[in-house]
Amino acid sequence: MGVVMTNDEQWIKTTCPRDCYDGCGIIVHKRNGEIFKVKGNRDHPSTRGPLCAKCAVSYNGVWLDENARLLYPLRRSGNKGGGEFERISWDEALAEIAQRFVDIDHQYGADRIYHTHYTGTCSVIAGKFPKRFFDHIGATEVDPDTICNAAGHAALSYVFGDSVSGFDPRTSKDSECILIWGANPAHCGPHVHEHWLREHDAKVIVIDPVRTETAASADLHLQVRPGADAALAFAMLHVIRRDALVDENYIKDHVQGYEEVLPSIECCTPEWGKAETGIPATLIEQAARLYARGPSLLWLGQGLQRQPRGGNVFRACAMLPALTGNIGKPGAGFYYLNDTIGIGGRGGGAPGYEKPRFNGGPPPVSQMDIPDLLQAPAAIRSYVVWNCNPLASNPNQALMRQGLAREELFTVVIDCFMTDTADYADIVLPAASFLEFDDVCSSYFHLTIGAQVQCRKPMGESLPNQEIFRRLARAMRFQESTLYEDDRSIIERTLRASGVRETWQELTEQGWAHVADEPLILWAEGRFATPSGRIEIASERAEADGLPRLPQATADAEPVDGKLRLISPAAKWLMNSSFGNDHRVIKMMGPATVTCHPETASDLGIGNGDRVRLSNELGELVLTLRVSDMITPGALLVYKSRWLKSEPDRANVNVLCVARKTDMGESTSVHATEVTVSRID
């Protein structure tokens, strides 16, 4: 089973299931039956050496620490939020949950049971199987993508009919330009940044309001004013049109709506772009020409669409490959996320989640609605949290805390650790870690499938997510066979669906497999999953949904009344909120800070090292100021996802973030938060 043994030592190949572009291979070194070291697989095409710093620390820290892990089912014994619990048996825990669900169903309806989840683990079974249970009972799902990337998915679906079939990264060997817009792989895909981005000779352009490590290493950095991305896309398109760099033949054969949007493009000169975006006109021209000449890859980051008109931004940016023909040929393409299993299977999907056996059921709700819904006893009677930590990750943190404190709200949290959210639970169930059960992982960047191999027995009485919900289904005496499908069956079906030739045995021995031997050229046939079969710049579906027919050349208005725009991207040492409880990670992060530009600091009369208060209508946060030109003037930078219980004020940046929806997808517009700043004397 992919295990190398010598005397009392073993080396096991497995895969990192974190929410990361890398999809790294891991070697687990065991000595005398115990895990001695978790390290990177040097033979893996993404990892090529050590793990990233955060995984290297945490996987050899809290993930192996029995004092940090949840080991047994727990029942609340004190006030909500106090973290006081008593140990109970699995039978007691499951019986209580089952009875409460039955009571809620009879009295209020099963749609009053809400379950929320996201990417605490991205492995196929643990990340998807529990949905079978909730769909079976008719519970309401909190749409996971609305905390992250739903606006981008909605926008690209209007344009291309698909948002998860990007480029194969291996095609970069034929690229002349790689444009990364609103992504920072140095933090969110460290091995992509270290290896892939520089392994060929393509020029790298980064568009980001922050001079990230990725931006600092690029050939060109366009430091756009937050909220002005659509305007920048139109200004670049103006240059491309003016300089005769559009691909007229590709447009004729594959694009709908070019003539309609052309008048807007012709108005958006580079000088206009400078006024809207803060980027010099010459730099706009340089980037536009470099991209248009191609072959070029366009990477649209998830952070880019976390703004009020994030969907419109994506529709505007999507015109770049459409109008230059940088799609469907070697070295060219666009990327948001890759459904690697679907791409490998040429349109299939991962079997971990099966569509419910019945039609209908309650529609999902947006994460942006949850802070308010939690205040309403008539709306939510039970809140089940798995694979996420919403108290740390959701906006409107104070309202989230207030809702979770409701005594009559029956809250169940399933996790490896006692998170901030778990402190408010009535029942806490211990989840097994990725080192403790078999599963399948797929990278959402590299088109690779990885074996997640059990390296040790689950700690204490912890169980994999899927086994927890099999047992809960049994406690509720359900008969539906899909609720009990075993892991090996799902693994084998997943491998077949992905198109890889390897068996599970072979995959564990190698550790990983590409879904295709040679680089795939996606969209090479020029047929798109839109109603017209073409790239739809002009979208009748968008129009029918109450949205503009065309992308708009807009920029957000700058804040007024002394307010500043706050952006809160991913931190180097955290993966969302994962790893936020590791004491070495906490030490490496240091105290939370806020960064502003020197011009902004001068205008406000504040200086480097000052203690400052960030305030708005939702709350306040006291932080130490860093003054740096890494952020554009008029904006503030605070990294997201610190655990509240590790912070002096028991709050992170989400105490300031408004649960405001994007223009499409009902997603988060967290990067449009506005605050005032004052020095604490």
Q: Which residue stretches match the model-derived regions?
A:
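N-terminal export/assembly segments and adjacent metallocofactor-ligating motifs
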Residues: M1-L245, C267, P280-A281, L472, ...
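Short beta-alpha connecting loops at secondary-structure transitions
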Residues: A216-V224, L447-M459
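N-terminal leader/propeptide and maturation segments of large enzyme subunits in energy/redox metabolism
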Residues: L74-R87, E92, H238, R242-A281, ...
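Long, contiguous, secondary-structure-rich segments that constitute the structural scaffold
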Residues: M459, P464-A513, D582-T595, E599-D681
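Conserved short loop/turn motifs at secondary-structure junctions
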Residues: Y114-C122, E276-I279, G301-P308, C388-L391
